[in-house]
Curated annotation (Swiss-Prot):
Pfam family, one: Zn_clus
Source species taxonomy: Eukaryota, Fungi, Dikarya, Ascomycota, Pezizomycotina
Cross-referenced InterPro entries: AflR, Stress_Response_Reg, Zn2-C6_fun-type_DNA-bd_sf, Zn2Cys6_DnaBD
Name recorded for this polypeptide: Transcriptional regulator VdtR
Consequence of gene disruption: Leads to reduced transcript levels of genes in the viriditoxin biosynthesis cluster and the loss of the ability to synthesize viriditoxin.
Source organism: Byssochlamys spectabilis
Keywords on record: DNA-binding, Metal-binding, Nucleus, Transcription, Transcription regulation, Zinc
Compositionally biased intervals (Basic and acidic residues): 174-192
Length: 436
């Protein structure tokens, strides 16, 4: 017999090259050189694979309790353990079902694998009059068969649900129990509640009743949120309203700010009817009185309360600058006629005598200067309460905002008062010169 031309067994190589395996990187498994070794100009070598057959754990999984002779076609020498706490007849009956006859101890491992698995043993109280042909029984039908008490699986699971659990349903018609339980929402109410965004839900907490002016200015449409009336009480001898012990200062300060925005409603501007000087001065005076009362309130304040209160003061100061026709030159938009508020100046009259425009402007400036000086005390109290101590019952993240607002109000108010005093001094000098 000639052995010429006979090739030996093919050597199995590793799937990844030695260099990629050592560096723990993915190998393209190209032979004779992988892509990584070819790009790096390095020698690529595939060593011999040391794996023979399946891994030991995968090969011996599930066979730890079986004699090795079984793998070679032998018989199982290890006896099956009897079922715990069950009579011998029940154990024997559990292994006598199937298509190929009873289970025996001399069966080979291949015969065991070819036989259908018996159903799980249900104990001695299980019904013994069950069908012997379990291979033809559907598994889903088996688990939904009625047990010894005549209950299905769903009925048995319902007994495990506590009585306190209630499932809320939303039928098309109104339920009778909704009258007894008003907390249950109908389907339409639930859909409306679910359609609200997080922004609207958060804004609804602090939005005032008269927030329509703000929303009209910002969005040009109706108010997004309508809140119930804020409970308030009137001080004796005072025209401004002060909130009670059950009030919400944040909502009250939002209402106060909304009144200033309602002075210049978009509907009035479109029709060409701007607010008069008297309307603006009255709105500013009422807003500062309410702001002073809210600032002196001893209740716990929300983190956004100082911000809204500072914006209110800045808004009042802006309206005063409109009245005296004074704008900040540092703001570029202030010089644009379409980007600033406009009012309708009305001459001042004493009975039948009407003052001229120059004298009316001087008297209006005197009145505004008096209110601005009174506003200085408000700004000073604001700075002492919210800007002096950054760790005084407030989050540290908002302290810079409070101090920025306080510095802005002090600077802008001081510059406005100084310019207005210079204007009045020049008017007095010119008026005295004309008289002399």
């Amino acid at each position: 017999m000639s052995w010429q031309g006979h090739e030996g067994p093919k050597v199995k190589l590793r799937s990844a090259c030695d260099r990629c395996s050592a560096n723990k990187v993915k190998c393209t498994q190209e032979k004779p050189e992988c892509e990584r070794c070819r790009l790096l100009s390095l020698p690529c070598n595939y060593s011999r694979s040391m794996r023979i057959g399946k891994p030991p754990k995968s090969r011996q999984r599930g066979l730890s309790n079986i004699d090795p002779k079984t793998l070679m076609g032998g018989t199982v020498t290890k006896k099956l353990r009897p079922c715990p706490s069950a009579p011998e007849s029940a154990c024997r009956g559990s292994f006598e079902d199937g298509d190929g006859g009873p289970w025996t101890e001399t069966m080979t491992f291949e015969e065991m694998l070819s036989r259908p698995s018996p159903p799980p043993f249900a104990g001695p109280s299980h019904n013994s009059n069950r069908p012997t042909n379990m291979a033809s029984t559907n598994q889903d039908q088996y688990y939904h068969d009625k047990g010894k008490h005549g209950e299905t699986m769903d009925e048995m699971l319902q007994t495990l649900v506590p009585d306190s659990v209630q499932f809320i349903e939303f039928p098309n018609t109104a339920r009778e129990d909704q009258k007894q339980h008003p907390e249950l929402r109908s389907e339409e109410e639930y859909s409306d509640y679910r359609s609200k965004s997080l922004f609207e839900e958060g804004l609804a907490r602090i939005a005032p009743d008269c927030a329509g002016g703000i929303m009209d200015v910002l969005y040009g449409e109706e108010a997004l949120v309508q809140m119930p009336n804020l409970p308030s009480s009137t001080h004796e001898g005072s025209s401004n309203t002060h909130v009670t012990s059950s009030h919400n200062c944040t909502r009250a300060v939002m209402e106060n700010l909304a009144k200033l925005y309602q002075v210049c409603a978009p509907a009035g501007v479109e029709n060409g009817s701007h607010p008069t000087t008297d309307q603006v001065l009255k709105a500013n005076s009422d807003a500062m009185k309410d702001a002073a009362d809210l600032l002196a309130c001893p209740c716990a304040k929300d983190f956004c309360f100082p911000i809204i209160l500072g914006i209110t003061a800045c808004r009042v100061l802006a309206w005063y600058q409109v009245v005296i026709d004074m704008y900040d030159p540092e703001i570029p938009m202030a010089t644009m006629p379409t980007a600033r508020e406009d009012i309708k100046h009305c001459p001042i009259a004493f009975g039948a005598y009407q003052l001229d425009e120059e004298v009316s402007q001087a008297m209006t400036s005197q009145f505004v200067l008096r209110n601005l000086r009174a506003m200085t005390r408000f700004v000073k109290t604001y700075v002492e309460n919210f800007c002096s101590d950054i760790n005084k019952n407030r989050p540290g993240s908002c302290s810079l905002i409070y101090r920025s607002l306080g510095t802005f109000m002090q600077t802008r108010l001081g510059n406005t008062i100084e310019q207005l005093e210079d204007r009045l001094a020049a008017f007095d000098g010119e008026y005295t010169k004309n008289i002399g």
